[in-house]
Regions:
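Transmembrane alpha-helices and adjacent helix-loop boundaries
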Residues: 1-158
């Protein structure tokens, strides 16, 4: 057992590293995709919807295989290390799910809060930062925590 401890420790550190980096990428992608899906410009909305539908509609294992085996082929020629493939695959996959969590949380804020922010003549950025996002984040925290636990469990595929 003692000779296996260094290997277990190394595997644990790799898992934590992949999970931490993937979580950061997933959070960034969730915010970007949510902003795209809620945009007024139709092509941006379409792009956000396409990202979410593609990454939620295919399994994580298929996506990881695609990133690792298909991207290095001639039309793309994008080669990544296994560590990078794990981070990108997990981050993009769970970012799509996180986008739906954020979108639902933003939609859960009562319309009266938007109207009150408009009545106070707050700028759109101030409205979002001071009034809407704090309430939405309270609603998004439990499912987002579950999603990050799923991401940690998803590292077993890499």
């Amino acid at each position: 057992m003692r000779e296996l401890f260094p290997l277990l420790l190394q595997g644990t550190l790799v898992t934590i590293g992949i999970a931490a980096c993937s979580t950061v990428l997933a959070i960034v992608m969730a915010f970007v995709a949510t902003a795209a899906k809620l945009a007024r410009w139709a092509p941006l909305r379409w792009l956000g919807n396409a990202y979410v539908e593609i990454f939620r509609g295919t399994s994580l294992l298929v996506q990881l295989f695609w990133f690792f085996f298909v991207l290095p082929l001639p039309p793309f020629r994008i080669e990544m290390t296994p560590f990078t493939v794990a981070i990108v695959g997990l981050g993009l996959h769970y970012g799509a799910y996180g986008s739906e969590i954020l979108r639902g949380a933003l939609r859960s804020v009562p319309g009266a809060q938007f109207e009150a922010a408009l009545a106070l003549n707050l700028s759109p950025l101030t409205r979002m930062r001071r009034i809407i996002l704090p309430q939405a984040m309270i609603n998004a925290l439990p499912p987002a925590t579950n999603l990050m636990i799923e991401l940690l469990k998803g590292t077993s595929l890499v």
